Amino acid sequence: KQFTKCELSQVLKSMDGYKGVTLPEWICTIFHSSGYDTQTIVKNNGKTEYGLFQINNKMWCRDNQILPSRNICGISCDKFLDDDLTDDVMCAKKILDSEGIDYWLAHKPLCSEKLEQWLCEEL
């Protein structure tokens, strides 16, 4: 599914302020990671990254490519490609708990300031 900024802001409201990361920071980071498209798959340095949050198959989810995956989120990677973001959010929070927001490389250079443009006016 191709989300809009406002749709995504609505769905991800529960993440606002989690571990000190604001909703506009998440929206910005997701935009620069996957363009709000749940179907995004990126192959990168022998890893494959899935979905809105670009969660990789080496550590966080399992697919048929990397064995063994640590599969910390205990989930099949293709679950991050559907429209239901519940499992994506659960895993993203685990990543944040363990790695911090810098797991998402876009965050520091692109999403740590000037965040007004990432707010949804309708909320």
Curated annotation (Swiss-Prot):
It comes from Equus caballus (Horse). Regulatory subunit of lactose synthase, changes the substrate specificity of galactosyltransferase in the mammary gland making glucose a good acceptor substrate for this enzyme. This enables LS to synthesize lactose, the major carbohydrate component of milk. In other tissues, galactosyltransferase transfers galactose onto the N-acetylglucosamine of the oligosaccharide chains in glycoproteins. It comes from the Eukaryota. Disulfide bonds join 6-120, 28-111, 61-77, 73-91. Residues 1-123 form the C-type lysozyme domain. SMART domains: LYZ1 (SM00263). Ca(2+) binds at residues 79, 82, 84, 87-88. CDD domains: LYZ_LA (cd16898). One of its GO terms (cellular component) is extracellular region. Belongs to the glycosyl hydrolase 22 family. It is found in: Secreted. GO terms for molecular function: calcium ion binding; lactose synthase activity; lysozyme activity. Mammary gland specific. Secreted in milk. It holds the Pfam family Lys. This is Alpha-lactalbumin A. InterPro entries: Glyco_hydro_22, Glyco_hydro_22_CS, Lactalbumin, Lysozyme-like_dom_sf.
